[in-house]
């Protein structure tokens, strides 16, 4: 009898436990439990004991106690982020012997009650720890961090750390990734990272560092120093081993010169944008070096670097960003050693000239951004830049270039010349005036922008034998497009823009461009289009701010199967006679922009929304017009008859008077 009673009690206990679990609002899937954003004040005590993943983020937890957290000994992932935790009971995580990932981000660990003896305590199997956003300061951090022999990733971002010492990181022998971004770090003591022999990724961005003069982390592969106040960067003078650094970010600092990178031969990514760099450069002649404010990485005065020596070891560099600096000149000797470079950004500098004349110069370069400088001259050698695919030159002052400047670039696919003063030559039979640039015969070029170049005449054959797919000739007021100017593009052109040119007549046989998908003719003075009588590929047609009153079906019929979007605002559209357009609106085959606000006019000059026009409105208008014509015709015929009758009467009266006198 007694065993039966015990069994009954056990079943009742399990039933009550199951009933209590059913009342918990957390979501449970397999061994994963999510209690995110439920307003909980404490860790639930009725969850399955075999839970491996527990998400308690976004609640109102203020303290973490060993019980009931210790009940869930199978936990591997524990997320306690975005709470109000200010108290950690000693040994709170001691029972979680399988815990691998722990997040305490965005809590209140900096409050005094979080500093109970032992801090976090030992975390023997934790590989990922997030303590970001807790207002932690340097002294507190050393007391909070415990032994973590398996830790690979540690985030201390968005805290209040001002200094790193040789005691900050200890008992973390396998740490690989350390995130310290968005603190207030001003000093890094010598040996601060000596206890991290496997550290490969270090993020120190958005701090208050002013100088790096003794960088000695040979094992590091990725270093982010962006958004500080660094004036100089220099490696240790006698490193114990070869540096492994491949990724270095120094953007948004106060660098005055190109850093000395002679000891970093493996570097493949270098970002120096948004600094004060000039080439060639260095400290003023009377300078004795730039001194750091304290010991450590910033301990020694910096020697004046040589830009030539700095560039020489960068033979493996793939990406170099020097945008937003004060560079006025790029010496040839600086570029000649960058034999692996694929991406070079020199935009937003003070360049007036750029030269790459040497044979084999920058052989691997695929993208060159020289936009928004003050370039007046551009000299590219016949065998230079052999791999260049994208050349960005917008926002410069280029004019009177050598005619074959771009024809020599054998791999060029995309060219942006917006905002210059470049005039295209014509085809072989019409070369054009002195100073024009040839765009014909560039067999690799697919995309060309000549926006805002003050082009007056686009000559016949300007792009002959150049298989362009995108051509933008917008914002050239007064542009005259000669007959045959776009000849040769009929089988390749997909995007054509002629916006804002003041065109009254379009001397382009558009229906012949069988691949054309996007056509922009906005902000001109056009009133007629060529007739598309056969099916084409056009999907988007922009006719805004022109002089169109009618879009007859006889001209637009060929677009019915392909056209998807039509822009018509700003045209004096007629409400009647636009049967094709009305059909598109009512059938929904074409997305006409802002149909509720698209205005049209009746013959009486009455303006209404085009979408509100009904067929009978035009029929009434037609009947009114017919009646008016009939009345006018009757009046005219009556006037003619009366005039004729009066004339006959006058003639007969004259004859009668003559006979009477006789």
Swiss-Prot record:
Residues 21-48 form the LRRNT domain. It comes from the Eukaryota. This is Transforming growth factor beta activator LRRC32. It comes from Pongo abelii. Its main location: membrane. Interacts with TGFB1; associates via disulfide bonds with the Latency-associated peptide chain (LAP) regulatory chain of TGFB1, leading to regulate activation of TGF-beta-1. Interacts with TGFB2. Interacts with TGFB3; associates via disulfide bonds with the Latency-associated peptide chain (LAP) regulatory chain of TGFB3, leading to regulate activation of TGF-beta-3. Interacts with LAPTM4B; decreases TGFB1 production in regulatory T-cells. Belongs to the LRRC32/LRRC33 family. Key regulator of transforming growth factor beta (TGFB1, TGFB2 and TGFB3) that controls TGF-beta activation by maintaining it in a latent state during storage in extracellular space. Associates specifically via disulfide bonds with the Latency-associated peptide (LAP), which is the regulatory chain of TGF-beta, and regulates integrin-dependent activation of TGF-beta. Able to outcompete LTBP1 for binding to LAP regulatory chain of TGF-beta. Controls activation of TGF-beta-1 (TGFB1) on the surface of activated regulatory T-cells (Tregs). Residues 18-625 are extracellular. Pfam families: LRR_8, LRRNT. The keyword Transmembrane applies. InterPro entries: Dev_Immune_Receptor, Leu-rich_rpt, Leu-rich_rpt_typical-subtyp, LRR_dom_sf, LRRNT. Residues 1-17 form the signal peptide. LRR repeats lie at residues 50-73, 74-95, 98-119, 125-145, 150-171, 174-195, 198-219, 220-240, 244-265, 266-286, 316-339, 340-361, 364-385, 387-408, 411-432, 444-465, 467-488, 492-513, 515-536, 537-558. GO terms for biological process: establishment of protein localization to extracellular region; negative regulation of activated T cell proliferation; negative regulation of cytokine production; positive regulation of gene expression; secondary palate development; transforming growth factor beta receptor signaling pathway. The gene is LRRC32. One of its GO terms (cellular component) is cell surface. Residues 571-620 form the LRRCT domain. Residues 647-662 are cytoplasmic. The chain crosses the membrane at residues 626-646. It is a single-pass type I membrane protein. Glycans are attached at residues 203, 271, 308, 345, 545.
